[in-house]
Amino acid sequence: NGNRVCPGVKGATNWMSQTFNPATGLLTLIALEQCDVFTSSSKEPEPKKSFSGGGARPTPQDVGQHFVRAFDPKTGKRVWEYPLTGAGEMWAGTVGTKTGVIFFGDDDGHAVAVDGKTGRNLWHYNVGEMLYASPITYAVDGKQYFAIASSTAIWTFGLFEPVKPVAVPKI
């Protein structure tokens, strides 16, 4: 019994970091498609004790699905989405670079980079545990890095170096 509400308590998007790229005009964020059944409680509040008045839980059939999604904030239209894997407990955010690469982590322990215009996977690395933190980028001596924390470590990766074309001699 109760009322099924979509999105649920953890659904849609929340406090996790979002990325806006002025060059593409896209807003990229983590989203959770999940509904909850909200119930009320007849229990009376008591002084100095927490009180919620009820609860909310997903049904066993509504396991939910996380996505990284890019939207055009002017139109509200979804431009692309990248499905995430794992248990659906991930609350990390996204971070973008000037070159249009979007970085994030997922429940299965993958640090991921996608093309910010298309959502195409560019790179991923399995760190072996959930990545709950929002990622950051920073530079040292002109080299840019991407970092994200897991429960036991801070994982740092150097960003891609552009490949320069090489002239091939004629034979």
Show which residues each predicted segment covers.
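Extracytoplasmic/lumenal domain signature
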Residues: 1-4, 34-90, 95-171
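Signature of short aromatic-glycine-proline-rich micro-motifs recurring in repeat-based ectodomains
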Residues: 4-19, 93
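Glycine-rich, aromatic-lined ligand/substrate-binding cores of catalytic
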Residues: 12-45
